[in-house]
Amino acid sequence: MTGTAETVSAAAEFIDRTLQNEGAWYRADEVAHRLGGRLASYGSSIGAVRGTVRDALRKFKDLDHDGTVMLASALWGQPRPGGRPVFERRLAAVVLLQSRVRLLRHSDLTRLEGFLRSAQAADLTAPLLADVLAPMLAGLGEREQQRASVVLARWREDPDPQLQAAAAALEEDLSLLNASRRTP
């Protein structure tokens, strides 16, 4: 195991354990009901998720780009083989990416596409679009934005209506951003 992989594993374990400790059965029941049982829930509050990610970033200061996207992927996945993905872990992945959006690159669009496809909840899709993808695209240079536009064009033609909607929203954001950059 490399140093980055060990750090990511320890950070994921820290976040998972903390979220479980912060959970409450009544919130877990409410989330399960709201999401139709598609995702498991620990019952952690949104504030607890944000605080846990903040604490993890303080504890594991050396997370670079690769470590950040590896940790987000670890949190997004199933906590154990055969288990259902957990809403709060996925929300923690979104909060992590929000916190480190400046590290993201156009090449991360494929991973984020996977997150959008498997989100199973608007409570995850909306912040992924507004707080991760839109600022990431806005921070790209011209060449990287052109490459990202190719990916968005593919999303626009995808049969998944969620990806089509994401492409439309993000392309509109990019058009507005590019128009404002050209205006003196």
Regions of interest found by a model, annotated:
Residues 1-184:
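Surface-facing alpha-helical segments and adjacent helix-coil boundary elements at the starts of domains
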